[in-house]
């Protein structure tokens, strides 16, 4: 039997959780974090990460929605990478877990290099 996909992906104006429904025509449905049957501490972390992400939205010019500095983004990315490992363990038996690990790990490396440059300038 096919497992439905459980996708962890941040987007503006919605939860970062997407779960497929419907056996004949699998369609992703956005699911509120509060509705997940997971560890309460992990649930709280996911809620906080989603809140932090939603805060970066720029109402005046949406294409410029971004973190204000490399440090805040680096901390956010690290927290996302930690939360995704735990979330996959929580739901991985029930669903096919989907997360763009390469993108997030690459972003962490980019930010790490940027921070090294920032702190090693004379």
What are these regions (language model features)?
Residues 1-122:
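Intrinsic low-complexity, intrinsically disordered or marginally ordered coil/linker segments
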